[in-house]
């Protein structure tokens, strides 16, 4: 048991260490490649500290403990004050034998306060299941300088728990993770800003991708009065349902997988060559929708009616044959894209789009690795009522429901909607926006930009499109006055894939909030560090990203240049 415990803990620590290292290494080394596409809004009124950095050790706010204050004048970024601390320290339920029966919980945070302050505040919503205080740089999806480098005061938090899903045993920790950490941290952060600079922030922004995108959508629904602009990337706003779909998907892949050590190894169900085969077939069917053959599907929704896996991908009997898929592979992939269902055919989540980005290594990561390592703990311990410890101790057998000993879709999927006397909020309650129509945000005049990679393998872009369609049906022409959606063709989960995943949508949001400039389109370009960009694309390729439902259409000229395309409502 000790070895198992160390292995499990190690797995989650590796995930969060990588997250921390990537945050430190992310520092905008490539944004200069296309810096002419960035705009620097200046509408908020800048400010400067009115007290010394170290005086923040004496900052006083209910339930808050300041544990460390330092000043960074290393020159790597703008000079800034770093404040670390925690809120609402308490004792709660643990997960023996991984943790003691009772453990200490607190909402850990870090704030970075630049000397050259822009007058703005940025809430950095983090990914995964949180659990670590990622440095508060304010890294922004799409590349470019961080919020800190642009003079924002930035906060980051662990959402009220440490690494690993064990916190799911504690009812309050679940709620802190879902939404309450934001509720607690926001007024404290603004008060700390007032203490340091002598005034509250003029404008406040909230941003994140993946679970961070979920945090952003939840905050836009619950706390619209606290923020002026929200920037949500690949948002898992139905995260419990998406995680259930991942487990269901693993069970589908297992039906066509080779056995390793007596169990199906789902990574053998599709090879990288199989992924490339499907990607090429999708391109063959859909590439020229926009009027030019360029290795991109610019209208992914229109593509769904044009591509048919049974017709467009050759079929073979031998699983080892090249240039074809077996009937079993086609059947499984078709089921995955149609969306998870229970035995009655009732949908558990939503469908996934056929997209050439299926070739991405990120697709394999989510389909074959995360589904058997991260999703079990998330579904079993965090989202389900009651929590199921076997999701951890049962290992792969629990994921695959081996011999009926694990996750049974019909029996266990409904647990994300359940409550009891101990867990009074269901997973689908504390993890999701309570008002998907964002009525408070719309009434206030706040702004929301959502972007989503069309090849996202975990949070279906179809779910986001369906949400925006419902929003548009509700508000009609007024929708675009406060909410915009941008689809990123070929992009995997938050970045990567055969895509132009560099873009400056965040400053478009700031311009919209502070100058009233509506973002109808922005320019996207190549990330030179993205190894999945096709070799026949120019490293200078650009494209317009169009506010949904508009799509880019070729009008003539150099197909590598965004100016050769225009956004058209189809």
Question: What name fits each language-model region?
Answer:
Residues 482-496, 528-531:
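Histidine-bearing beta->alpha loop at or near hydrolase active sites
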Residues 24-120, 133-142, 279, 292-293, ...:
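Catalytic-loop region of hydrolases
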Residues 218-220, 225-343:
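A catalytic-pocket lid/entrance helix-loop region that shapes and gates access to the active site
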Residues 199-210:
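Alpha/beta-hydrolase fold nucleophile elbow
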Residues 449-452:
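Short beta-strand/loop motif that positions the catalytic acidic residue
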Residues 208-218:
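Glycine-rich nucleophile elbow surrounding the catalytic serine of serine-hydrolase chemistry
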């Amino acid at each position: 048991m000790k070895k198992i415990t160390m292995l499990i803990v190690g797995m989650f620590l590796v995930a969060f260490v990588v997250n921390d290292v990537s945050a430190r290494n992310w520092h905008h080394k490539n944004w200069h490649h296309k810096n002419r596409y960035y705009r620097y809004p200046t509408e908020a009124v800048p400010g400067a500290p009115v007290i010394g950095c170290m005086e923040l050790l004496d900052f006083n706010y209910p339930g808050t403990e300041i544990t460390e204050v330092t000043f960074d004048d290393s020159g790597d970024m703008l000079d800034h004050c770093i404040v670390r601390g925690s809120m609402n320290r308490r004792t709660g339920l643990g997960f023996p034998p991984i943790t003691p029966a009772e453990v200490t919980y607190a909402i850990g945070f870090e704030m970075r306060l630049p000397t050259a302050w822009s007058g703005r505040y940025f809430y950095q919503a983090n990914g995964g299941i949180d659990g670590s205080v990622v440095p508060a740089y304010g890294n922004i999806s799409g590349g470019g300088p961080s919020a800190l480098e642009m003079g924002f005061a930035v906060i980051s938090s662990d959402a009220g728990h440490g690494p690993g899903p064990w916190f799911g045993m504690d009812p309050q920790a679940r709620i802190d993770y879902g939404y309450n950490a934001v509720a607690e941290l926001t007024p404290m952060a603004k008060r700390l800003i007032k203490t340091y600079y002598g005034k509250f922030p003029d404008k406040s922004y909230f941003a994140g991708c993946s679970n961070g995108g979920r945090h952003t959508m939840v905050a836009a629904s619950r706390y619209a009065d606290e923020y002026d602009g929200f920037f949500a990337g690949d948002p898992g706003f139905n995260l419990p349902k998406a995680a259930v779909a991942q487990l269901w998907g693993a069970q589908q892949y297992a039906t066509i997988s080779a056995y390793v050590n007596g169990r199906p190894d789902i990574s053998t169900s599709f090879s990288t060559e199989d992924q490339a085969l499907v990607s090429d077939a999708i391109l063959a069917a859909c590439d020229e929708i926009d009027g030019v053959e360029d290795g991109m599907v610019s209208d992914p929704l229109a593509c769904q009616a044009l591509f048919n896996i049974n017709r467009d991908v050759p079929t073979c009997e031998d699983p080892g044959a090249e240039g074809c898929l077996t009937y079993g592979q086609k059947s499984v992939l078709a089921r995955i894209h149609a969306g998870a269902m229970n035995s009655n055919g009732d949908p558990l989540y939503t469908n996934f789009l056929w997209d050439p980005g299926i070739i991405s290594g990120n697709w394999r990561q989510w389909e074959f690795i995360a589904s058997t390592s991260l999703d079990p703990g998330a579904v079993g311990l965090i989202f389900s009522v009651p929590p199921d410890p076997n999701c951890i101790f049962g290992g792969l057998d629990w994921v695959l429901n081996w011999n009926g000993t694990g996750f049974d879709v019909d029996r266990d999927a409904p647990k994300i909607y359940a409550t009891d006397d101990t867990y009074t909020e269901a997973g689908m309650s504390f993890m999701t926006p309570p008002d998907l129509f964002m009525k408070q945000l719309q009434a206030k005049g706040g702004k929301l930009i959502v972007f989503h990679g069309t090849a996202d393998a975990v949070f279906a872009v179809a779910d986001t499109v369906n949400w925006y369609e419902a929003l548009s049906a509700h508000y009609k022409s007024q929708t675009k006055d406060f909410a915009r959606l941008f689809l990123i063709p070929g992009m995997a989960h938050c970045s990567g894939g055969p895509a132009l995943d560099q873009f400056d949508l965040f400053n478009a949001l700031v311009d919209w909030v502070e100058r009233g400039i509506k973002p109808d389109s922005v320019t996207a370009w190549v990330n030179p560090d993205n190894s999945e960009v096709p070799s026949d694309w120019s490293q200078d390729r650009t494209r317009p990203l169009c506010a949904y439902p508009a799509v880019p259409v070729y009008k003539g000229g150099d197909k590598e240049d965004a100016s050769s395309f225009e956004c058209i409502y189809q």
